[in-house]
Curated annotation (Swiss-Prot):
InterPro entries: Erg6_SMT_methyltransf (IPR050447), MeTfrase_dom (IPR020803), Methyltransf_11 (IPR013216), SAM-dependent_MTases_sf (IPR029063). The keyword Methyltransferase applies. It is an enzyme of class 2 (transferase). GO terms for biological process: methylation. It comes from Lentzea aerocolonigenes (Lechevalieria aerocolonigenes). The keyword NAD does not apply. Glycosyl O-methyltransferase that catalyzes the final step in the biosynthesis of rebeccamycin, an indolocarbazole alkaloid that inhibits topoisomerase 1. Has broad substrate specificity and functions as glycosyl O-methyltransferase on a number of rebeccamycin analogs. It catalyses: 4'-demethylrebeccamycin + S-adenosyl-L-methionine = rebeccamycin + S-adenosyl-L-homocysteine + H(+). Monomer. Changing S148A: Reduces enzyme activity by 50%. This is Demethylrebeccamycin-D-glucose O-methyltransferase. The record marks H150 as: Important for catalysis. Its EC number is 2.1.1.164.
Amino acid sequence: MTESKSEGTAVAAPTPEEVRQMYDDFTDPFARIWGENLHFGYWEDAGADVSVDDATDRLTDEMIALLDVRSGDRVLDVGCGIGKPAVRLATARDVRVTGISISRPQVNQANARATAAGLANRVTFSYADAMDLPFEDASFDAVWALESLHHMPDRGRALREMARVLRPGGTVAIADFVLLAPVEGAKKEAVDAFRAGGGVLSLGGIDEYESDVRQAELVVTSTVDISAQARPSLVKTAEAFENARSQVEPFMGAEGLDRMIATFRGLAEVPEAGYVLIGARKP
């Protein structure tokens, strides 16, 4: 375990290797129960009858709109999951997408998805570390990180790498967790449980996030707090795994499953737990 800092307090957090192992082991059961978008959803109205699949696609669409790409552009997807957002982006905007992940099983599934969609000629995925990208300078027209940068032990370094491989004038889109205000007591315990259980190595306020983006020599063009739209994901995740208990217990064990469900339900009671979309460009 490493130390990860949030609001000045050191807490136990998984190592990068533990994050990789988590995705190697947990991607398949999570995708079966939550869906093939391995990220939060976007609900315009928390009470609306909108499925998880539709809500997670909606969040992908918000990122597509934020990215501002043109037909033929080359896009880097940092933390590609099993490829559904990248395929949706490529289809919607007629772009070429290169996705990366530190999970080889995810990369294999993502490439299979691109092939099945008939997009293997312009959507590809590979094993790579976001903090040491294996690409030339200025080799992409756009970069996005959809709910992945919180896994980085050094978010600033990852952002600098994203900026390095982006051409001048290129755009960046980020979706990620933030803390809207400092937390203490039971709220801090809930946040710390999420950090430890969710592989969260970088978590802080919106101002801190924007500062990291600017220090990567990128210009912040928009910041949208979508905490209210993303928050239903917490309870819905807990409900989905509770309803699938018989499928998950053999893999996670009863204690591990109970801990996961409690973590998501606990974080749902923390209004300071937020979610943000950040747009940027390279001068």
